[in-house]
Amino acid sequence: MNVKVYNLDGSEKGDIELPAVFEAEYRPDLIKRAVISSLTAKLQPKGCDAFAGYRTSAKSIGKGHGKARVRRTAQGAGAFVPQAVGGRRAHPPKVEKILFERINRKEKLKALASAIAASANPEIVSARGHKIEGVPSLPLVVNAEFESLVKTKEVLEVFKTLKLDADLERAKDGVKIRAGRGKLRGRKYIKPKSVLVVVGDACEAITASRNLAGVDVITANDLSAIHIAPGTMAGRLTLWTENAIEKINGRF
C-alpha cells in the first residue's frame, strides 16, 4: 500500500510504500494486554514489617471476665489487634500479590503491529475522539526534513499546514483539574492525548514538539503499544516521518 508524503509546506512530495504492518489485523484484546503490561511494569511490590503491631507485652486474660478477649497491657489498654491503637493492620499489603500483567514477546509485538494498523484507520482514529477533518491522509507521512526543526513555533506551523491544529486545540481545551485526592499526589491535571510524532532517530524535533499540548514524540525503535494506544484505546492520531517508516519496516 502506498501513501502520499507531504512537505513541510503541505505540498505533496511523492509516494512511499508502507510496511505490511499497516495492514495487520485489529486486535483490541491484545492491545489492551500489552498496554497494561507496560503500565504494571512500573509498579513495585510492597509489604509491611512482619512484626508491625506485635512488639508489645500485652497478654490475653482469656474468657470468663465479662469483657472482650483482646490482648491487654498491664494498664488494661487493648493492644495487638487491628481495632486497638498501635495494633497491626487488618489486611496489610502483601509482597506476594501479583501486580504484573505478563505477556509473551511475540504477543507484545503483534499487539504493537495491531495498534499501528489501527492508527491508519480513519474510523478508529475518529472514534477515539481525534479531530481529523481536513487531515490529508492516514497514515500521515511527512518529509524527513521535519526532524531538523528546532523551534516549537516551526512545528506548530507544520501542524497547522497539515490540519492537525484542530486536534491540538481539543487537547488544550480538555485540560482540567482532576477530581479527588489525586490532586495531592502529583497528578493534579487530566491532560488529553493529541498527536503522536514518530521520528527515525533522536533529533531536534523531539524537544521542539513535546511542549505542545497533548503531543508526544518517540523514536521508531522505542515505539510501543503504550505510546500509540494510550489508555488501552487504539487509534491515536500519528504523524510519521519518512525515516520512521523505514525504521518500522526493519522491526517487523
Swiss-Prot record:
Q: Name one GO molecular function term.
A: rRNA binding
- GO CC term (a single one): ribonucleoprotein complex
Q: Does the keyword Glycosyltransferase apply?
A: no
Q: Which GO terms describe its biological process?
A: translation
One matching Pfam family is: Ribosomal_L4
Q: Is Ribosomal protein given among the entry's keywords?
A: yes
Gene3D superfamilies with a match to the protein in the record: 3.40.1370.10
Q: Which InterPro entries match?
A: Ribosomal_uL4, Ribosomal_uL4_dom_sf, Ribosomal_uL4_euk/arc_CS, Ribosomal_uL4_euk/arch, Ribosomall_uL4-arc
Q: Superkingdom of the source?
A: Archaea
Kindly state which keywords UniProt assigns to this record, in alphabetical order: Ribonucleoprotein, Ribosomal protein, RNA-binding, rRNA-binding
Q: How does it assemble?
A: Part of the 50S ribosomal subunit.
What role is this protein assigned? One of the primary rRNA binding proteins, this protein initially binds near the 5'-end of the 23S rRNA. It is important during the early stages of 50S assembly. It makes multiple contacts with different domains of the 23S rRNA in the assembled 50S subunit and ribosome. Forms part of the polypeptide exit tunnel.
Q: Can you tell me which family this protein belongs to?
A: Belongs to the universal ribosomal protein uL4 family.
What is the name listed in the Swiss-Prot or TrEMBL entry for this protein? Large ribosomal subunit protein uL4
